[in-house]
Structure formats: structure tokens, C-alpha cells
């Protein structure tokens, strides 16, 4: 059985797409993950097993001039050396890198050993690690055609790797989780790991207005529950069955991280996207603009939002749900099978 090395990390957005691919390729290949002793390990280890998770000391890239950057070249060199040792031991046929600082030394080590590398970029613009390694890769795959257009002849737009469990999402189980009966339209609000606090604050202000017409379910994030109890409102810190909850929702208000928007589009969910304004290179705004131009969502500027404008966006998303779903269908967001086929080649 051939071995494929998966890598990527720094945020969950660099890990979860790999897990989506591992889920469908693990019967054909030995799937190994190289990551740090952090979030990658917590998320990826259950997918590959302890014997197939290899931990490295990856140096985080800092975009600003800081004293830590003075030692970065030495830290990266040590990480690359560590990865060379791991790859020599594994002798993989391919390295699949999903971006983030964790993937950089793995890819560099693979180049040194002449192991083919395929990268995938989820966002509308390419992240730093992928930009640094793309020219030596066997293939550059992207979720957005705008990213593929800037990456040369080896680039192709495939769509995004998506967890196939979205297609077995159960609306009835989602309703049970929310506590709502489905007689009114349901709005699900989720801010993600980085953008929950400010989105929760906005919802708190808008809640009296929004709940006049809709039931609202908030996935608040750990330790970020709203200090309020109101009719037509329910919340949880975290949801293991988030796809069931999405299935029960009539519209989702969310940040515009690539994984979130592609999964929601694959589920054909009307959405109001509120880009995280402090995203590192403005990628969330670019993602939201792309989906808006394709007719797949509505967008809102966080700094300009009021309770009234948020309610208005939700009203418009509900009214335009059928058109939005048609646009999402035409977009063909799920690239899991296409990417798996590229890996098999």
C-alpha cells in the first residue's frame, strides 16, 4: 500500500479539508499526517491513528517585524531537517499540503528528496506558505478560479475538500438540538473560532428585533454564551452535529472562512456572510465578495452593521433563498472527488 503524507496547520481551516480527503482515501493508501503538537494533532490524530501522526516543531511565520523573526531561518532549517528524517522513513509517493506554517518545512523537505508535492489553496487569495512553495509543486489546486488564474499552467480550480458527512445531515436531529419545532424560519448564527465574540455582541443587540419574525440559534464558541434568555432564542457553545443544525436552519449568518462557505454552499444554504475584518490578508472579504458576485450569498460589513441592517439582510436572504440555492448548485463547490483523483494520478 502506497503512503501519502498530508500536512497543513495553524488553523482548523488548514486541517479539516485534509481530514475530508483522508476519509475517502484511507482505504486505498496509508494516510500519514505531519503536524505540530497543537490543534493539528487534536484534529488529525483521530483520522489517521497514533502510529500515523508525526509531530514536528514548526516555526510560525510572523508578518510584522519582530525580534522572533531574527531566529526564524534557523528554526525553519531545523524543522526541514526534522521533516527530511520523517520522509526518509516513510518513503511516501506524494505529499499533499494544505497551507499554513506547518506545511512549509514538510514541502521543503519533500522537494529536497524529490517527492512530488501537491498543494491546495482554499481561499480566494493564496496564503504565505503556499505562495512560497507553489513554483516547485507538481500541481496547485484551488477552491477559487481567481486563485488558480495567478498560479501558472500547473494550477487548476477543483473546488474545496468537503466532509462528506454533510450529505447525511438530518434536519429532524438538528431541530432536536435547537429545541425549535420548525414552525418559524430558523436563523443559525456561528462566528467561528476567531470571530465569535464580536458577532455574538452584534447578535445580542439585534436579538429583540430578529426574534420577532424568526427563531435564532447561536453557536457561541467556548466560554462565549450570551447572558440572555429569550423566547425564540437558544444557544450552545459547541455543536458536534453542526451539519444537522445547518440542515434545520433556513439561513446561516457566518464568517466567510473558506471551509464554512464551501460547506454551506454544498448544503445549498442561504447565507449572510460577515467577513472577519482582521483576517490576515483580507481573505475573508475576498471569499465573501466572490460568493456574492456568483449570487451565492449576501454580505455585510461588520463595522457598518446595526440590528436593523442585520435583520434586513436576513429578510432578503429568506426572500431570495431559491435563487441563492440555484447559484450554489451551479458553482459546484464540492471538490473532494476531483482532488482525490488528482492525488491518485
Please tell me what each predicted stretch does.
Residues 316, 332-345:
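C-terminal alpha-helical cap of glycosyltransferases
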Residues 33-35, 39-49, 167, 171-173, ...:
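Donor-nucleotide binding loops and adjacent catalytic segments primarily
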Residues 294-322:
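C-terminal "capping" alpha-helix adjacent to the active site of nucleotide-linked donor transferases
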Residues 65-94, 112:
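An amphipathic, basic-hydrophobic alpha-helix
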Residues 30-32, 50-51, 111-172:
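Active-site-proximal region of nucleotide-activated glycan assembly enzymes
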Residues 92-94, 247-262, 269-270:
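Acidic donor-binding loop of glycosyltransferase active sites
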Residues 3-9, 30-75, 158, 301-303:
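Conserved nucleotide-sugar phosphate-binding/catalytic loop shared by glycosyltransferases and other
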Amino acid at each position: 500500500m502506497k503512503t501519502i503524507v498530508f500536512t497543513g496547520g495553524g488553523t482548523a481551516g488548514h486541517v479539516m479539508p485534509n481530514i475530508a480527503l483522508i476519509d475517502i482515501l484511507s482505504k486505498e493508501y496509508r494516510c500519514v499526517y505531519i503536524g505540530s503538537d497543537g490543534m493539528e494533532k487534536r484534529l488529525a490524530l483521530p483520522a489517521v491513528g497514533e502510529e500515523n501522526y508525526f509531530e514536528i516543531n514548526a516555526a510560525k511565520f510572523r508578518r510584522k517585524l519582530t525580534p522572533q523573526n531574527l531566529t526564524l531561518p534557523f528554526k525553519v532549517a531545523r524543522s526541514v531537517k526534522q521533516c527530511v528524517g520523517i520522509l526518509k522513513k516513510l518513503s511516501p509517493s506524494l505529499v499533499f499540503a494544505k497551507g499554513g506554517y506547518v506545511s512549509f518545512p514538510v514541502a521543503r523537505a519533500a522537494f529536497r528528496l524529490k517527492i512530488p508535492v501537491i498543494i491546495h489553496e482554499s481561499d480566494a487569495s493564496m496564503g504565505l506558505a503556499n505562495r512560497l512553495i507553489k513554483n516547485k509543486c507538481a500541481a496547485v489546486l484551488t477552491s477559487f478560479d481567481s486563485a488558480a488564474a495567478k498560479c501558472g499552467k500547473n494550477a487548476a480550480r477543483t473546488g474545496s475538500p468537503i466532509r462528506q458527512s454533510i450529505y447525511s445531515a438530518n434536519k429532524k436531529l438538528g431541530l432536536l438540538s435547537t429545541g425549535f419545532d420548525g414552525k418559524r424560519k430558523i436563523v443559525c448564527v456561528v462566528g467561528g473560532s476567531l470571530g465569535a465574540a464580536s458577532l455574538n455582541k452584534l447578535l445580542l443587540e439585534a436579538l429583540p428585533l430578529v426574534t420577532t419574525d424568526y427563531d435564532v440559534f447561536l453557536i457561541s464558541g467556548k466560554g462565549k454564551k450570551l447572558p440572555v434568555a429569550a423566547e425564540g432564542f437558544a444557544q450552545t457553545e459547541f455543536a458536534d452535529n453542526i451539519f444537522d443544525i445547518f440542515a434545520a436552519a433556513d439561513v446561516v449568518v457566518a464568517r466567510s472562512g473558506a471551509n464554512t462557505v464551501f460547506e454551506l454552499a454544498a448544503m445549498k444554504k442561504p447565507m449572510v456572510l460577515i467577513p472577519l475584518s482582521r483576517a490576515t490578508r483580507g481573505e475573508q472579504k475576498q471569499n465573501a465578495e466572490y460568493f456574492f458576485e456568483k449570487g451565492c450569498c449576501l454580505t455585510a460589513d461588520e463595522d457598518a452593521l446595526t440590528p436593523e441592517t442585520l435583520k434586513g439582510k436576513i429578510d432578503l436572504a429568506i426572500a431570495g433563498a431559491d435563487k441563492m440555492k440555484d447559484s450554489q448548485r451551479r458553482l459546484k463547490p464540492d471538490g473532494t472527488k476531483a482532488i482525490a483523483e488528482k492525488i491518485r494520478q
